[in-house]
Regions:
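Glycine-rich phosphate/adenosyl-contacting loop at the front of the ribokinase-like
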Residues: 1-67, 72-86, 258-259
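Conserved phosphate-binding/catalytic region of the ribokinase-like
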Residues: 2-8, 176, 180, 206-321
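Active-site-proximal loop->helix
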Residues: 72-84, 102-106, 110, 128
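A glycine-rich helix N-cap at a beta->alpha junction
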Residues: 84-96
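Conserved phosphate-binding/catalytic loop of the ribokinase/pfkB sugar-kinase fold
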Residues: 93-94, 104-141, 146
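A short, aliphatic-rich alpha-helical micro-motif
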Residues: 133-137, 182-183, 224
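Conserved beta-alpha-beta core of the PfkB/ribokinase-like small-molecule kinase fold
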Residues: 141-217, 237-239
Length: 321
């Protein structure tokens, strides 16, 4: 059971925690090519842990549930995330599998390529989730990503639907999503590529229009699965919110910055969004706040290290067009 009182409002993040091994170079290598002259850095990462850091730094009480190895990387994860103020008391240590690792290559424009060895993350199972049922049902907002097994994700949302939490899915890395999951979530947050791939995986007809109209139509189709909000992140172009119940589309611009590292920007967005929803903000206002936060994160190296604090976001949001 968590250290937090069960009647406190909190963000619950369930997902992955990795060690990120980053190489920064002028450009990304092509298949079969070696690019030299880069610099190396080691950071804590994993979509779930990144989002937990973003949530807690932006002011929300935050609980993280995941599975990490009984190894030095796992020790670092537990220590560092606890120091951030995240409740890690429900994290499972796996004696049989190593902690997850991500190898990340980043070019001079901040664009990246990532390869992940999930390790213990991929052994977070349904029984681990059932043991945490009360924590899940009593969360104010819940975020899950797809670096853990799909059957585990399905169990999470089944349990969450017995409570009143705001259920958010970040469908990354994208893979086929059972209809039972889509019918159990309130908000889905894909990037543009994930939106179109999910639309195709769900066997909707090909959309002939381009640009914003294509995003809106894909969002409408996916929302008909029963999802209240489809929020599509567009990187430097901001994001588009589709509200199914109101039939309203809202475009949120971003803040122009000099991006040096986009790793973790989406995680920053998701974690901060969950934090603001936990505090009672509307979806549109929460998205604006999350957009401002992500615009800070891309100006810094590292995933968790780049996550801004509440006071920084409060200043940055004043620059939103």
């Amino acid at each position: 059971m968590t250290k937090m009182e069960i009647n406190e409002k909190y963000v619950l993040i369930i997902g992955s925690s990795n060690m990120d091994l980053n190489i920064y170079s002028q450009r990304l290598p092509k298949p079969g090519e070696t690019v030299t002259g880069g610099t190396f850095s080691q950071f804590l990462g994993g979509k779930g842990a990144n989002q937990a850091v973003a949530a807690v730094r932006s002011g929300a009480k935050t609980i993280f549930i995941g599975k990490i190895g009984q190894d030095p990387f796992g020790d670092q994860m537990l220590s560092r995330l606890t120091k951030e103020g995240i409740d890690m008391s429900n994290v499972i240590r796996d004696p049989e599998h190593l902690s997850g690792v991500a190898f990340i290559m980043i070019n001079k424009n901040g664009e990246n390529m990532i390869s992940v060895a999930p390790g213990a993350n991929f052994y977070l199972n349904k029984s681990d989730i059932v043991k945490n049922s009360e924590i899940i049902k009593n969360a104010k907002s819940l975020v899950v990503q797809m670096e853990i097994p799909i059957e585990t994700i399905e169990e999470i949302y089944t349990i969450a639907s017995e409570g009143d939490c705001i259920k958010i899915l970040n469908p990354a890395p994208l893979k086929p999503i059972p209809i039972t999951i889509l019918k159990n979530i309130d908000i889905i947050i894909p990037n543009e590529g994930e939106l179109y791939r999910l639309h195709s995986l769900l066997n909707f007809p090909e959309i002939e229009t381009k640009g914003t109209n294509r995003i809106i139509q894909a969002s409408k189709d996916i929302a008909e699965m029963g999802i209240n909000y489809v929020i599509t992140t567009l990187g430097s172009k901001g994001c588009i919110i589709y509200d199914r119940k109101e039939g309203v589309v809202t475009e949120i611009p971003t803040i122009k910055v000099n991006a040096i590292d986009t790793v973790g920007a989406g995680d920053c967005f998701n974690g901060v969004l969950a934090s603001k929803l936990c505090k009672g903000e509307t979806v549109v206002n929460a998205v604006k706040y999350a957009t401002a936060a992500a615009s800070i994160a891309v100006t810094r190296k590292g995933a968790q290290e780049s996550m801004p604090y509440a006071e920084e976001i409060d200043e940055q949001i004043k620059k939103l067009p």
